[in-house]
Amino acid sequence: MRKLTSFTFVALTALAVSACSNSSKEIEQGTEQELYAKGQTYLQDGDYSQAVRYLEAVKNRFPAANYSEQTQLDLIYAYYKSQDYTKTLVAAERFLQQYPNSPNVDYVIYMAGLTNFASGENFFQDFFGVDRATRENTAMKAAFANFQTLVDHFPNSTYAQDALARMAYIKAALARHELAIAKFYMKRNAYVAVANRVVGMLQQYPDTQATLEALPLMKEAYEKMNLPDLAKQTETLIQANKDKKFSDVEKPKDVELNKPKA
């Protein structure tokens, strides 16, 4: 039985090596049309890692060919679906530089936003419950900037409505993040840092529940620093907003992405 198992393993390994060898040969020698068609087949099958192999071969071997723009769009999609966010952003930036007048610019900006959004979500999941309050979520801020660019320059885009919803969610999430940092500093008696954080929240995220909840922290920080006038001003602000409550902003549902045509 052991011999049979061993022979079976050797046979399967040989098949895998043979298939890999054939695939590599195909990528090295295939025509532009053959490689692109193969990449499309893998995309449709949801085998994004294989799709990337063939599409990258098209891009690298035939950089000025007929499929160049479409290949780059497909790669952005395949990288994103593979959760290779670094390559997604690099590909998106390259596309915007090479095809600034493409009718798919809004799609590429949107994909950059989704990519940064996904990276930022990973950060938040890692952050809350873990003592890492001094870290900044640059990915979520980048996502907000991407979506802002999209709605400013392409207000009628198919992706504008979802971008707006994600901006609202990001704003609320970043405000909660700032509140967590303010609490972190308060526990360490870093009162100047607390006050500065909440002032920043008032400037950047005034219409969020987290900012309202941060006001008492700012008041306490001023009191601890023996700044009664600022503490009194903060109390006035608290009283002016005591009946106000902002509704929770739900995370937008994942969208059904379709590959655009160049």
Regions found by a protein language model. Give the residues of each.
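Conserved glycine-rich beta-strand-loop-beta hairpin in the small C-terminal domain of fold type I
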Residues: F9
